Amino acid sequence: MKDILKIILDILYPGKCPVCHKIPENTENMICKSCWSRLDFVGKNYCMKCGKPVLLEEEYCEECGRRRRNFTQGRSLLIYNETMKASMIRFKYGGRRQYGDFYARLICMFGKKQILEWNPDLILPVPLHRRKKLARGFNQAEYLAKKIGKELGIPVVSHVLKKVKNTRSQKKLDAEKRRKNLRNAFAANEDFTGLKILIIDDVYTTGSTMDEIALVLKGKGAEKVYFFTICTGYN
């Protein structure tokens, strides 16, 4: 019965390509063949700490090279270029949940090996403040996390990490202002003693969000805090 319902829904409401937002030639692939070539994957040369692209001879990006990180390690799948910026805006603010289906599948395809090497006990999504979640209708990181957790068999917990401070937008803030903006913005109400935790989000920029979350989780006993995101900015 569920399979029949899915077929009917796919016919009535076919999924849209996350890049051009048109119906793909093959809806099972979830992306147009021509749009696939527009995805700019992070290559083999990346920061050993945060996963940002770096030059061949560099081990760390500029930011990770000059300051200590609270998180253990992180990786991202794609470069945050103009194509991905438009896709992420539609995903987050346009309620395009089907984009999350595609990106979660992509992370599981290309990031599975790394995630399983980290061997996390739990997956936590980056939380939204309740006002922002109400305005958007959903938390894109939570949607991604649940899809990834289900595929990889890792428990996902959404209610233990909260955004308690309704911070202003980070878009136009530099790294230092982002850190100040996020100070004391998150809180956790569980004990994570000895646990390895994987944080899921859509975009990694300066690392301020991941650092602040890792600080909170380690304060609650977490042994290691990793992250995986769809996109990352340039070094």
Where do the PLM segments sit?
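Glycine-rich phosphate/pyrophosphate-handling loop used in enzymes and phosphotransfer proteins
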Residues: 1-200, 205-235
